[in-house]
């Protein structure tokens, strides 16, 4: 059965490359900001490039933060890519500007401390045991990153009632940051799977199978 993915159009992100990548792995893709379509599709993909503040303004302009919250409250799959991952956290700080995010995860997006920025190009990630996102992918696979900001320090609070997110990390120079998160219906990547060749295609295929 073909899965339908709503690709959220809120003025940020390379929609065409994400659409092609999803169609390549068998999804039916609708590029839209319509709340009903975004809420009822099998999956919702949230892209994002540029500044955290600008992305949040665009997202709120189409009520995207509410769409994400509504889907997750009902256990319906959402995936964020690049800044589309960053805005899922509590806040972002860029150029001294503090901006509130969607708040699905605690944590702060901040400037990386590496010498060479942006972090642009191919890099490996620290694949976690039991990962559905990276199923069928080896630990030496490389993924395409392009970013200056990220989540560098994330302390997970655990209790007996909830399952903590499965966090995949990456390192640029000596700076360690969150590369991907799996948290039930909510998945996200700092890298661009749609630009990551066969490995990225397999990851997107895993997400389509997950939804």
UniProtKB/Swiss-Prot annotation:
InterPro entries: Class_I_gatase-like (IPR029062), GATASE (IPR017926), Imidazole-glycPsynth_HisH (IPR010139). It is found in: Cytoplasm. Its EC number is 4.3.2.10, 3.5.1.2. The active site is at 82 (nucleophile), 192, 194. Keywords: Amino-acid biosynthesis, Cytoplasm, Glutamine amidotransferase, Histidine biosynthesis, Hydrolase, Lyase. PROSITE patterns: GATASE_TYPE_1. Pathway: Amino-acid biosynthesis; L-histidine biosynthesis; L-histidine from 5-phospho-alpha-D-ribose 1-diphosphate: step 5/9. Residues 4-211 form the Glutamine amidotransferase type-1 domain. CDD domains: GATase1_IGP_Synthase. GO terms for biological process: L-histidine biosynthetic process. Pfam families: GATase (PF00117). The keyword Magnesium does not apply. Its main location: cytoplasm. SUPFAM superfamilies: Class I glutamine amidotransferase-like. GO terms for molecular function: glutaminase activity; imidazoleglycerol-phosphate synthase activity; lyase activity. It catalyses: 5-[(5-phospho-1-deoxy-D-ribulos-1-ylimino)methylamino]-1-(5-phospho-beta-D-ribosyl)imidazole-4-carboxamide + L-glutamine = D-erythro-1-(imidazol-4-yl)glycerol 3-phosphate + 5-amino-1-(5-phospho-beta-D-ribosyl)imidazole-4-carboxamide + L-glutamate + H(+); L-glutamine + H2O = L-glutamate + NH4(+). Heterodimer of HisH and HisF. PANTHER family: IMIDAZOLE GLYCEROL PHOSPHATE SYNTHASE SUBUNIT HISH. IGPS catalyzes the conversion of PRFAR and glutamine to IGP, AICAR and glutamate. The HisH subunit catalyzes the hydrolysis of glutamine to glutamate and ammonia as part of the synthesis of IGP and AICAR. The resulting ammonia molecule is channeled to the active site of HisF. This is Imidazole glycerol phosphate synthase subunit HisH.
């Amino acid at each position: 059965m073909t899965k339908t993915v709503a690709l959220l159009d809120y003025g940020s992100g390379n929609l065409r490359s994400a659409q092609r990548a999803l169609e390549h792995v068998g999804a039916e893709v609708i590029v839209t900001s319509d709340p009903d379509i975004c809420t009822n599709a099998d999956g919702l993909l949230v892209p994002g490039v540029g500044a955290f503040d600008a992305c949040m303004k665009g997202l709120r302009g189409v009520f995207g933060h509410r769409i994400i919250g509504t889907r997750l409250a009902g256990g319906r799959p959402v995936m964020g890519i690049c800044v589309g991952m960053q805005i899922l956290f509590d806040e972002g700080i860029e150029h001294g500007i503090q901006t509130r995010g969607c708040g699905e995860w605690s944590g702060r997006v901040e400037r990386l401390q590496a010498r060479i920025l942006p972090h642009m190009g191919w890099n490996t990630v620290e694949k976690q045991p039991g990962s559905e996102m990276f199923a069928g992918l080896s630990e030496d696979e490389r993924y395409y990153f392009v970013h200056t900001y990220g989540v560098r320090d994330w302390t997970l609070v655990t209790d007996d009632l909830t399952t903590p997110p499965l966090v995949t990390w990456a390192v640029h120079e000596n700076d360690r940051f969150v590369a991907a998160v799996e948290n039930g219906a909510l998945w996200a990547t700092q890298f661009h799977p749609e630009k990551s060749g066969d490995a990225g295609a397999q990851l997107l295929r895993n997400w389509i199978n997950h939804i």
